[in-house]
Amino acid sequence: MGFWQQILESRQIFLKIVHKFKLNSIKGFLSLFLVGVSLSVAIAACSGNGASDSSTSTDAGGSTAKPVSANNQDVRLTLVSFAVTKAAHDAIIPKFVEQWKKEHNQNVSFEQSYGGSGSQTRAVIDGLEADVVHLALGLDVDKIQKAGLISPGWEKEFPNNGVVSKSVAALITRSGNPKGLKTWADLAKDDVKLITADPKTSGIARWNFLALWNSAMKTGGGEQKALDFVTKVYKNVPILTKDAREATDIFAKRGQGDALINYENEIILAQQKGEKLDYIIPDVNISIDNPIAIVDKNVDKHKNREVAEGFVKYLYTPEAQQEFAKVGFRPVEETPQTKELASKYPKIKNLGTVQDYGGWDSIQKKFFEDGATFDKIQAKK
């Protein structure tokens, strides 16, 4: 029965009641009043049902959207990342929040934590309930996996083996490059002092070591040549600092050493802040790949997996990759949108990868475990 047909029939019933009862009697008046109240409730119920059946929502573009679910509650994500990604994420997150709201009619808020990749890894293992981690190297994600927080095979869940940002190694020199450093090989000269952190305690120092080893392997050398070369370089390291920040302080503030190895993106970001640096990007280099992963145990606890996956996928879009490129990271994939930004980076003729050396598990065992290659190199100093 239609809404207006119900109203007409109710009106006819009401008129019959009026005719039957005498309005001058109290009993008749009360009966009429109660019937009127019941009729009003019935009409209101009919009206409510009619409005519900035709309910839709319209977005800003004028298109009709599905009704919003009563369970479509606000969602919070916790992002834990290594320090130098902050500028990029600060630009990316509002864009993702806006897009998710438009497509899902759901509000998303973020809690963010930034710091050294190693310390962030330990914090997550010790109880920082990250939903998404963006770290400096895959070895750190593997540690969280081994702690039971991330499911095995995390690197296959997203494109590029889970790598969402990348850079290469850069060689910073003193102003004017007085030692005339041009390639990695120059670091083995007797009169050159290199400042770097200990690769057994620092993530960036592991990349530094791989850049040196890779340079020997990619220029026609074998394992023995690489070992001899890297041994000579580390003999030129006066002190191994505990982390990259301390290495930078010793080089920049204390004036020690002739060269410092750092990420290219860190140098670009420093230049954007007005710092003047002399540096070289060797054309034989290592791809410094920064992976991202969902912390499965935490998203299952927080029941926000869908949004976490949506955020990670958004980081691979041209819009997000542009923001990474603006602060010095190289795009993980060249697209028409990122091609212009990518053109500002020096070309790398021979680029090595972690996969060239068996992945992080193999690298850790071969080079950085107790008694492995790096300890043997240090024993020769």
Q: Whereabouts are the PLM-identified features?
A:
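Short, low-complexity disordered leader/linker segments with a strong preference
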Residues: M1-D74
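Alpha-to-beta junction loops
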Residues: G127-V133, D191-V192, K253-A259
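Ligand-binding cleft/hinge of the Venus flytrap
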Residues: P94-H104, A185-D249
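Early extracytoplasmic/lumenal segment of secretory-pathway proteins
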Residues: C46-A147, E157-F158
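Ligand-binding pocket segment of bilobal, Venus flytrap-like solute-binding proteins
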Residues: T219-V284, P291
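Extracellular/periplasmic juxtamembrane helices and adjacent flexible linkers that interface
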Residues: G48-S52, V299-K381
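Extracytoplasmic
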Residues: N72-D74, N105-N107, S119, G127-E129, ...
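A conserved helix-loop-strand patch within extracytoplasmic ligand-binding domains
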Residues: N71, Q145-K218
